């Protein structure tokens, strides 16, 4: 906290945070941790994958300047997921700066089963859709890639069955890219073998959650 406050005073940022270092030494949980630190798994967000110190869209946890939070409208308790991103968005919209520093590291223990991982990322997707409804023009490729992947897979299967088997090609390309990426992301042989399934679970669960997110999920 002392380091975060020093950075805040030096940079003038209204929120200072660092890296969510997903880590585990146990089986599937270890593989999931590696996926959550990879760009193929979670995109290029600094607080997941690391990077140099500087302004950021959001940070993990964070040390907030109280007056700035109050000026931005406070913490919105209606959000079940993505609360930190939503608050940081309002802070930035209000003229504040969010600062990432890689020296601030918090160890995170990820889910340890496919079922729990799928449920987690399904909820992430659902609430990301809520964010895009409440704050228009905030969706970027990182957030839209999973639902696009789900739609492409569904269309590929439909066209392959109804028109021509060649339309199954995008699915093969998607899973081939996961397999190739897993070779570089996975640390051990077991990780490399499990990684494609872990990545697909993260991507597709998020995508399905985003697509099926009901408007009534957010109580206005």
Question: What do the PLM-derived regions correspond to, one by one?
Answer:
Residues 1-38, 97, 102-109:
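Conserved donor NDP-sugar-binding/catalytic core segment of glycosyltransferases
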Residues 2-3, 30, 86-90, 127, ...:
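Alpha-helical elements of Rossmann-like donor-binding domains used by nucleotide-donor carbohydrate transfer enzymes
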Residues 15-25, 32-61, 70, 134, ...:
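Short, flexible, basic/aromatic active-site loop/helix in glycosyltransferases
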Residues 48-81, 90, 94, 102-103:
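Conserved nucleotide-sugar donor-binding catalytic segment
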Residues 76-139:
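Catalytic donor/gating beta->alpha subdomain of glycosyltransferases that bind UDP-sugars
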Residues 139-147:
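Select subsegments of transmembrane alpha-helices in polytopic membrane proteins
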Residues 148-219:
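Membrane-embedded multi-pass helical conduit in multi-pass membrane proteins
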